[in-house]
Amino acid sequence: MRAGLAGIVLAAIVFLIPVHTVAQSAEKGNAKGKSLDGPGGVIAVNGVRDENLPPPPVGPTPHATDGKPNLSGIWLSGNYNFANMGGALPLQPWAQKVMEERQATQSRDDPEAKCLPAGVPRITPYPFKIVQSPEVIVMLFEGNVHSYRQFLLNRGHDKDLDPSWMGESIASWQGDTLVVDTVNFNDKTWLNGRGAPHTEKLHVVERYSRPDLGHLEAEITMEDPGAFTKPHTFKRTHVLSATWEIHEYVCNEFNVDVDRLVGK
């Protein structure tokens, strides 16, 4: 099992094509668009598709040999304002104060600006590749020196792991929806570019579905009794690219003067 997973990850890394680095700065920007409330109080993320991208392929949902929807492919997030996570987060007073203090310093201490892992769900503005098998699903992200997440299917959480940047993810299929359950985070990441904090009690549930060939829909629920007053759910839609490859992104190479980051 471990050897198989290593092979999947290694294969995904070995065949990267070093063409060019893509700037992903939308998270701190103000993308234009209309904010829409989704069904049942779920809020859709404000965003506008990049008109320079070709339209996604058209066709029915592909299926794997085990009959489950095949989520494999390279997925792009379009030109989204990823600081917007479906409206204001339900932060407790102390967490709201921390976020405001970070904004006042123009996010000078953002861990991602220091080439540290973005965490979940913040990592998703970057293009990512899904490699799917019946036992494990791997997401390889273009950003942050190729962070990856692995979802082991049909097993429980490991109670003996130390908290980590990306947490520990397990997954299961509920009909045609892949449900990813992630816990055991450290408290070092920001939830968004505006500096929203969380604690080690953060629990993230992602529900992925592929309604057709060209789209991957994600419904994300975050709960953190240490920092939130209630759970928060929002949606994102990713589009399949038939031409994109995961490009080399060496954050540390260009981030050579961290002590002089713009900020206050």
Question: What are these regions, as identified by a protein language model?
Answer:
Residues 1-9:
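Bacterial N-terminal signal peptides that target proteins for export
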Residues 5, 13, 17-264:
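PEST-like low-complexity, intrinsically disordered acidic/proline/serine-rich tracts
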